[in-house]
Curated annotation (Swiss-Prot):
It is an enzyme of class 4 (lyase). It comes from Corynebacterium jeikeium (strain K411). This is Imidazoleglycerol-phosphate dehydratase. NCBIfam families: PRK00951.1-6, PRK00951.2-1, PRK00951.2-4. GO terms for molecular function: imidazoleglycerol-phosphate dehydratase activity. Belongs to the imidazoleglycerol-phosphate dehydratase family. Its main location: cytoplasm. Its EC number is 4.2.1.19.
Length: 204
């Protein structure tokens, strides 16, 4: 739990002809989630993100999932990134960097985060089958990379996600989401040794 007297909460919403998204993200939460995107497996992943990041996360989304889940997932990432950026504020007192290795059965994933204000994404190591696998009839695993990249760009963080090895598309996806959750949790935690913004430039 952060020592901030006021919880760091970001709220954002976005409505287009393809989707309608509302997000509330509390960085100083306890892992409570309220997720409803119309894509059950994506709900499962966002629930894991909140729970393992110890974030209170509310995501309500409606999109054209009867056509494809891609619009809903990518638009949700946009709004989540905006909410995360708002919650981070001036970033004073945070650790800034975080990383995590997460195993899931035969899979091992790693994520590293720099809350730098310089958005960048690198995703490597997913096996070729992730380009064509579909989970639950709606979630195409090729969307993983789009989600993480869009989240990073809109929250203005540098995010690196690696699948070191794995076979099952479900396990690979879940390990990646949990690794991002843990890395982000570490990066946004209060650092009692840092009184201001964790940068030699004085700003992030």
């Amino acid at each position: 739990m952060a020592t901030n007297p006021t919880p760091r909460i970001g709220k954002a919403q976005r409505a287009t002809k393809e989707s309608d998204i509302q997000v509330e993200w509390n960085l100083d939460g306890t892992g409570k989630t309220d997720i409803d995107t119309g894509v059950p497996f994506f709900d499962h992943m966002l629930t894991a993100l909140g729970a393992h990041g110890s974030f209170d996360l509310k995501v309500h989304a409606r999109g054209d999932v009867e056509i494809d889940a891609h619009h809903t997932v990518e638009d949700t990432a946009i709004v989540m990134g905006q909410a995360l950026a708002q919650a981070l504020g001036d970033k004073a007192g945070i650790r800034r960097f975080g990383d995590a290795f997460i195993p899931m059965d035969e899979t091992l994933a790693h994520a590293a985060v720099d809350v730098s204000g310089r958005p960048y994404y690198v995703g490597v190591g997913e096996p070729e089958q992730m380009l064509s696998s579909v989970i639950g009839g709606h979630y195409a695993t090729v969307i993983n990379q789009h989600f993480f990249e869009t989240l990073a760009l809109n929250s203005r963080i540098a995010l690196h996600v690696r699948c070191l090895y794995g076979r099952d598309p479900h396990h690979i996806t879940e390990a990646e989401f949990k690794a991002v959750a843990r890395a982000l949790r570490a990066a946004v935690e209060d650092d009692p040794r840092v009184g201001g913004v964790p940068s030699t430039k004085g700003t992030l």
